[in-house]
From Swiss-Prot:
Chain's role: Prolactin acts primarily on the mammary gland by promoting lactation, mammogenesis, mitogenesis and osmoregulation.
Residue positions the entry lists as glycosylated: N61
CDD domains, alphabetized: prolactin_like
The protein's name in its UniProt record: Prolactin
Intrachain disulfide bonds: C34-C41, C88-C204, C221-C229
Keywords per UniProt: Disulfide bond, Glycoprotein, Hormone, Lactation, Phosphoprotein, Secreted, Signal
Gene field: PRL
InterPro entries noted in UniProt: 4_helix_cytokine-like_core, Somatotropin/Prolactin, Somatotropin_CS
Length: 229
C-alpha cells in the first residue's frame, strides 16, 4: 500500500476511534443501542441525535472516499457521470434540493425522508457488498468501505427510528420507500455496463448520504438546540 493510501486508512481509523470514544463517554453503545429493545430505551434524545449526526457524517465521508476510489480505478475517460445524472432509485422522494429548502421543511417531514432514504438503501448496500466481493482485483479501499457503510446504515436507521419515536410519540411511520431494482445491471457480463452501474450506485449513495447528513444536522440544531447553533 502506498503512503497516501496508508494515510487515508489511518485517518479513517482515527475518525472511527474518536466516534467510538465519544459514544462510550456518553454511555451510548453502538450495537445494540437499547439491549431490551427500542421500547425500553433509556438513551436521551440529545445523545441519540449526537450519535446519529456522527454516524451520518462518517457514512458520508466513507461514501465520498469509496466513490472517488472507484472513479479513479474504473471510470477515467468513460463518461459515466453523464449517465449517472438523475438516475438514482431514490429520485422519486420529494427531498429538499438544498439547505435553504430543508430549513423550511417541517421536522416530521425531514425525519420521514431520512427514514425513507435509509430504508431504501438497505437492499442495494447488501448487494453492493456481495457483488464487490466478486470483482477481480477490486481494491480493499472499496470493499472495506462498502462493508462499513452497510453496517453503519443499519445502525443509523435504528437510531432514527428511536428518534422518531421520541420526537413524535405514538406516531406510526409507515411511508413507502423506493425499491431498488438495479441488481441485474451489477451482474451483467458487459464490463463497461457493469462498471457504469456500480458508478451510478456509488454516485447516488454519495448524494443521498450528503442529504441525510444535512437534514440530520438541521434537525439536531432545530430540536435539541432550538436553532441556536
Amino acid at each position: 500500500m502506498d503512503s497516501k493510501g496508508s494515510a487515508q486508512k489511518g485517518s479513517r481509523l482515527l475518525l472511527l476511534l474518536v466516534v467510538s470514544n465519544l459514544l462510550l463517554c456518553q454511555g451510548v453503545v453502538s450495537t445494540p443501542v437499547c439491549p431490551n429493545g427500542p421500547g425500553n430505551c433509556q438513551v436521551s434524545l440529545r445523545d441519540l441525535f449526537d450519535r446519529a449526526v456522527m454516524v451520518s457524517h462518517y457514512i458520508h465521508n466513507l461514501s465520498s472516499e469509496m466513490f472517488n476510489e472507484f472513479d479513479k480505478r474504473y471510470a477515467q475517460g468513460k463518461g459515466f457521470i453523464t449517465m449517472a445524472l438523475n438516475s438514482c432509485h431514490t429520485s422519486s422522494l420529494p427531498t429538499p434540493e438544498d439547505k435553504e429548502q430543508a430549513q423550511q421543511t417541517h421536522h416530521e417531514v425531514l425525519m420521514s425522508l431520512i427514514l425513507g432514504l435509509l430504508r431504501s438503501w438497505n437492499d442495494p448496500l447488501y448487494h453492493l457488498v456481495t457483488e464487490v466481493r466478486g470483482m477481480k482485483g477490486v481494491p480493499d479501499a472499496i470493499l472495506s468501505r462498502a462493508i462499513e457503510i452497510e453496517e453503519e446504515n443499519k445502525r443509523l436507521l435504528e437510531g432514527m427510528e428511536m428518534i422518531f419515536g421520541q420526537v413524535i410519540p405514538g406516531a406510526k411511520e409507515t411511508e413507502p420507500y423506493p425499491v431498488w431494482s438495479g441488481l441485474p445491471s451489477l451482474q451483467t457480463k458487459d464490463e463497461d455496463a457493469r462498471h457504469s452501474a456500480f458508478y451510478n450506485l456509488l454516485h447516488c449513495l454519495r448524494r443521498d448520504s450528503s442529504k441525510i447528513d444535512t437534514y440530520l444536522k438541521l434537525l439536531n440544531c432545530r430540536i435539541i438546540y432550538n436553532n441556536n447553533c
